[in-house]
Amino acid sequence: MRQNFFCIILAITQGIHTMTEFSTPDTEQIKSHGLTPDIVAQQLADFVRGFPYANITRPATVGDGITELSDPDIARYTEKYIAAQKTKKIVKFVPASGAATRMFRDLFEFLNTGTENDTTRRVLDNLDKFAFWDDLRQFLPATPTDRDKIACILTDAGLNYGNLPKGLIAFHKYDTYSRTALEEHLAEGAQYATANGTVHIHFTVSPEHLAGFRALLARTVPEYSARYGVNYDITMSNQRTSTDTIAVNPDNTPFRTDDGHLLFRPAGHGALIENLNDIDADIVFIKNIDNVTTDKLRGDTIKYKRALAGLLVCLQSRAFEYLNNFTAHDLNEIRTFITNDLCVRVPDDASADTLRQILNRPIRVCGMVKNIGAPGGGPFWVRDENGTESLQIIESSQIAPDARDIMNASSHFNPVDLVCGTRDAHGNKFDLGRFIDPQTGFISDKSYGGRNLRAMERPGLWNGAMAHWNTVFVAVPASTFTPAKVVTDLLSPSHGAK
């Protein structure tokens, strides 16, 4: 008879003692995720302790943390970027994991309950305006009911969109064909992310959708390569199970499934910092899979992507010059650059070593859109325990109730429009794991099999996972932010609907 050994872990974190017993099967399950009992015990301690609120001091606004580019600025930075395209490796990084379930939530409600809602009615009244109409009608019976139409959109009786990721959904209708969100990224990448004639695009994809992405790419890449006169280098990766976090009961004890197993959950987009860390590039553009528009409306996107990248190149160039010739420069000159250009405000007594350390970080230039009621995090000034103020993208869940007035005064929001420099002054890749603030995770209430649980997300990719980067915010027009969060967004003018 096999002996059932127990691994007992004592996690001691900021005065919190958590004794956790893991059985041999538990330990084997933990290791199968690429985790260790110590890591899981630390996660359990984090549930007990919670995560502190961000110490926001004020919102970033134009003139105080957000730069507004003039036409001469845009021209100058664009010229810098075009020059960099000749010598730099450029990658477009597109988070594209997960099914589009939320995009079709109201349609699922109608399908499951028969209760019509405004979204469903609008979809049914405008079916022929969607890019997927020609594909959809091939599945419809001769005299389809409303339920037939919705079922053929969502289920494998038709398009099966309810089980597909957004990247594989037809977003835009052109004169003789339609394009998926993935195809729009191919087109977009060819227009600003080329380097020596090649477009490098990396998609993060769920394992169950890899085959679908590969099939679509095999059909479309040759077409777009010929259309734009470029070569494509497309790579894909999965969110690693080693970034999963354990789920707990409401009393913070490990949640177990009906068969007694521990439950691990994907830890949110912050886990993708490991995928980003694997990217070998000088310049990385980051943009979500659903934030695309049509060829005719893409002008502002191309214009500002180039300008933001050129600004990044200029900031890197100066930071590298200071690092490589640190003693040759006056410390006040370096401090002024750090304060005015890198937007890091250090205490007056900050040492030369502190200034050098600040220069030696990854840099990101982030577009910020004026508030129009869209969801998403916002740009804020945040003060750390050493008194240093820097710019951060902060989610509402990170803001204390008594700081809501500061949050409500925010003028801009985060559209996830990042241009990143991940090499150091010697051309070596930074280890991005060194620049995460582990105390910026999220805990939320979820359910599994009808039972309540608590889930933990790692620090968000553009939030705590980049907390110790140098961050610069630039105002960009709302025309660069055209996501499809719900299916009826595809009927908006920004998606080419007429």
Which residues fall in each region the model found?
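Short linear interaction motif-like sites in intrinsically disordered regions of transcription factors
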Residues: 2-3, 134
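Short, Lys/Arg-enriched N-terminal segments with co-localized hydrophobic residues
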Residues: 3-18
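N-terminal regions that are enriched for targeting/export leaders
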Residues: 20-62, 76
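Primarily single-stranded nucleic-acid-binding OB-fold modules
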Residues: 342-364, 373-382, 388-394, 403-498
